[in-house]
Amino acid sequence: MEKGECILYPCYFNAALSRAEGRRVPRNIAAKGPNANDVERALRRLGIACQAEEHHHPAHWARHEGRIIATYTGKKEALIKKVARAIEVRK
């Protein structure tokens, strides 16, 4: 991973998961069953360069949900919240 890159997994935005299971945003801005394409679309709408990969979250190795590498120089938590608000798939 290069400097200025953030790895985002769809589980960060999944309202069905608990914080212990990997969700990183509050439930009120989380999405229902987001996938890597939803995260990628949200990043592109925000004007953030990104690239999808066929990898999985280490804790969810059997799901093969993919991941997104975003080029972002700010804090990862700020990026995660921006993306969560931009994802169109909601509860």
From Swiss-Prot:
SUPFAM superfamilies: SRP19. Its main location: cytoplasm. GO terms for cellular component: signal recognition particle. It is found in: Cytoplasm. Keywords: Cytoplasm, Ribonucleoprotein, RNA-binding, Signal recognition particle. GO terms for molecular function: 7S RNA binding. GO terms for biological process: SRP-dependent cotranslational protein targeting to membrane, signal sequence recognition. The keyword Cell inner membrane does not apply. Pfam families: SRP19 (PF01922). Belongs to the SRP19 family. Part of the signal recognition particle protein translocation system, which is composed of SRP and FtsY. Archaeal SRP consists of a 7S RNA molecule of 300 nucleotides and two protein subunits: SRP54 and SRP19. Involved in targeting and insertion of nascent membrane proteins into the cytoplasmic membrane. Binds directly to 7S RNA and mediates binding of the 54 kDa subunit of the SRP. This is Signal recognition particle 19 kDa protein.
